[in-house]
């Protein structure tokens, strides 16, 4: 009967409920994938070394150990530019790749950037630091860089009235979210200080090669203020009774 059919309720199509949790999970997954992609891209995007003075240039390299020794003997100050140090490194160090990547990595080189201290939120100027950079090529023309920050700190030795203690910390004066110090870089990606333990093996042989020079500076007690682009070594302060 048509009247009975009209009186019957029409079937209601069941609606799919809006899933807030499902959409949040989807967006969270997309965000994680985007973050991973960015990390991979940044780690394989090398920092620019074309603007690094003296990098890979052996010509006219200064004899830094000799110049430093003369300054110590004369109780005089001496200053080296990035170009001076990088030419010296290019002429004196011959880095080699070891391990699993040895058959892929070629033409490694070492350079240094000198960063002056930056102004902190409280108005104080942070310590200057040096950035040791290792550059190598993998494959046909794929350039890769890693770097390690070294910040020098000096204080008077409480056990030896005439001595100065020098130590180096593996970070610069920049911080990541949470106040974590930046210890170095992989490509253009800043790496927290705590993760530098994974990069230290790449720098150990390099640091060992220059231990005599490092010890000469430490034993002399010379100050090591670092300004933008320059390493300044100053005679130790005379302590009076």
What is each of the regions a protein language model found here?
Residues 1-6:
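N-terminal targeting leaders characterized by basic, low-complexity, disordered sequences
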Residues 7-241:
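Extracellular/lumenal and peripheral-membrane lipid-interaction modules
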């Amino acid at each position: 009967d048509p009247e009975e059919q009209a009186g019957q309720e029409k079937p209601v199509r069941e609606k799919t409920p809006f899933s807030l949790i499902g959409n949040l999970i989807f967006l969270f997954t997309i965000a994680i994938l985007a973050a991973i992609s960015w990390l991979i891209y940044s780690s394989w995007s090398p920092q620019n070394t074309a603007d690094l003075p003296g990098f890979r240039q052996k010509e006219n390299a200064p004899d830094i150990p000799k110049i430093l020794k003369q300054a110590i003997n004369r109780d005089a100050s001496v200053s080296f530019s990035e170009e001076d140090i990088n030419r010296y490194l290019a002429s004196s160090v011959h880095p080699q790749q070891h391990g699993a990547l040895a058959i892929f990595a070629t033409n490694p080189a070492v350079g240094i950037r000198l960063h002056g201290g930056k102004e902190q939120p409280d108005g104080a100027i942070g310590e200057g630091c040096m950035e040791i950079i290792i550059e190598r090529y993998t494959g046909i023309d794929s350039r890769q860089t890693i770097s390690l920050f070294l910040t020098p700190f000096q204080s008077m030795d409480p056990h030896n009235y005439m001595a100065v203690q020098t130590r180096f910390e593996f970070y610069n004066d920049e911080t990541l979210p949470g106040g974590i110090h930046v210890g170095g870089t992989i490509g253009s990606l800043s790496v927290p200080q705590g993760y530098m333990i994974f990069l230290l093996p790449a720098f150990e042989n390099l640091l060992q090669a220059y231990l005599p020079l490092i010890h000469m500076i430490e034993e002399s007690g010379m100050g090591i203020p670092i300004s933008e682009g320059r390493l300044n070594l100053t005679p130790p302060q005379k302590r009076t009774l």
